[in-house]
Amino acid sequence: MKKIFLVLILTFVYVENAFAEDLLKALKQAFHNNAELNAERENLNVSEQDLKITKSEYLPSASITSSKSQEDTNKLTNQSGGDATISDVNPLTTSIKIEQTLIDFGRSADYKKKKIGIDLARQKLLKKEQDIIFKAIEAYSGLVLAIEKEEINKQNVDLKISQLQTDKIRLERGQIKVSDFSQTESSLAGAEAQYIQAQNEVVSSRLNYENVIGTLINENSLQKSIKSFVKIPISLENAIELSKQNNHDVKIAQLELEQAKKDIIIAKSDLAPSASLSLERSYSEDLSSTYDEREKDILKATVSWPFFSGGKKFATIDKNESIKARQRLLLDSAVRNNLTAVTSAWAN
């Protein structure tokens, strides 16, 4: 629930200079170097390239083809059955072809889906940024706390050792009983165990810090002093409205539902006709024993209607309908979870 108001917290939190310099430096380091965050940025780049690929389907395609063959005629007869003169040829053919798709009912839906994909990738990136910033703050404060606990436990062990030495002298003088001295030894053993645990927590917290934020050069530079002033919504209704606008889980579910709708349109378009137009110019040399060169232009219009393919396309439509229903249920669940979370956070 802390994450719900993280944007507001980051906007309205003010800290003392020493803490701000170190914490903000750590947050900046995490923002630029965190592996999960960089992976999400690459995912956004992938979505942008997918959109470019889809745009290319609206543009004509051009290709150059060249082929050379060797033709050896073993036998050649004329109409009367006699042998004809054999002239072997080695034709060389080069062609240039330009083709443009004129009608494709799924092309527009695919383009819109890819545009939604960019918005979806951006929302996931924003969500990951907030998650990493939140984890970085937890890692920073967790390491500061672990170091302080280690120091407190170290001082406690030193105190117990001093007390043990004092009680040993008192035992020799008969001022305390053996049972009292044993209790002091037991207390020292407990303090040492807590100190070892605190040392382990420092190691664990340091590893977590370096995993989330990056390399830690000097632990002594970490500061714990902080004064924060957080602006919170004025009412529960205001909090719910803000969460509807800013909750990334809800936005992601909405965008995934829109993508599922486009998938249905794309699947249905596979059953619709498509049309293309192409222009090809070819050049041939040593074409045959009769002709040496040929230059030919071919203008071709093609219409295709794949109305049946063994039921595969209809099954794909049914599958995408089920995916859309699932995404709608996930969106409803995200909205309810968001409302429950905000209400619970406000009550606490």
Language-model regions: role of each:
Residues 19-67, 73, 216-258, 306-307, ...:
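Bacterial Sec-pathway N-terminal export signals of envelope proteins
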Residues 4-13:
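Sec-dependent N-terminal signal peptides
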Residues 38, 61-84, 88, 99-127, ...:
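Small/polar (Gly/Ser/Thr/Ala-rich) solvent-exposed segments
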Residues 39-54, 128, 132-153, 162, ...:
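Amphipathic alpha-helical coiled-coil segments
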Residues 22, 29, 36, 103, ...:
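Surface positions of alpha-helical coiled-coils, especially the charged/polar e/g heptad sites
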Residues 60, 92-96, 239, 297-303, ...:
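Hydrophobic, lipid-facing positions within transmembrane beta-strands of outer-membrane proteins
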Residues 21, 131-245, 256, 345-348:
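Periplasmic alpha-helical coiled-coil/stalk elements that build and connect Gram-negative outer-membrane
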